[in-house]
Amino acid sequence: MIKIAPSMLAGDFSQMGEQAAMIEKAGADWLHLDVMDGHFVPNITFGAPIIKSIRDKSSLVFDVHLMISEPLRYILDFVKAGADVITFHIESDSPVDETIDLIRSSGCKAALSVKPGTPVESVFPYLDKLDMVLIMTVEPGFGGQKFMADMMPKISALREECEKRSIDIEIQVDGGISAKTIEEPARRGATVFVAGSAVFGADDPAKAIAEMKDIAANCQ
């Protein structure tokens, strides 16, 4: 099932609660929340207290993407803040197995992400323990970047590996996703699409979400 996860990174941080409610009414499935520490990536966004403050404004799945150096230290903070899905990077400094285990034992779904320069095969040893893999189609850290089409073989390789091992997980793509770019990742097996400016910058967010869902669904 296709899911659209608008990224709050493209929204107005001064109205996060209102915008979370708005995109839910517009037909979004998840709310993607990018947490950046200024170390793992150059930018700084927000942390667990902000996420907690908007949790009661929306019933959407809170999809928390930790672009931080030591995710293990902060997992429980984001669990308590109301995260439903917690994604961390294979390139982070935290032990992967221990971090996944803590996320799942705390009642959240666990996901691993790979930067553009990281082989997707790096997550293969952990697939049995994951609910999702996030393939970055831009360099993480800033919104509004151009979609990297050369990341598409990663989606195909991941989907093939999952099918070979009878593993059923979500494949998420994040970066430059819009109605113009969603077709190819959907055709290759992606199921969750993070869209920032394509939703928050649209004159009609509901129309933008519906259009992306329709295009992606027709490619499955």
Task: Give the role of each language-model region.
Residues 32, 172-173:
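Generic enzyme active-site microenvironment
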Residues 138-140:
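Short glycine-rich anion-binding loops that position phosphate/pyrophosphate groups of nucleotides
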Residues 190-195, 200-201:
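Acidic, Mg2+-coordinating phosphoryl-transfer loop and its flanking beta/alpha structural elements
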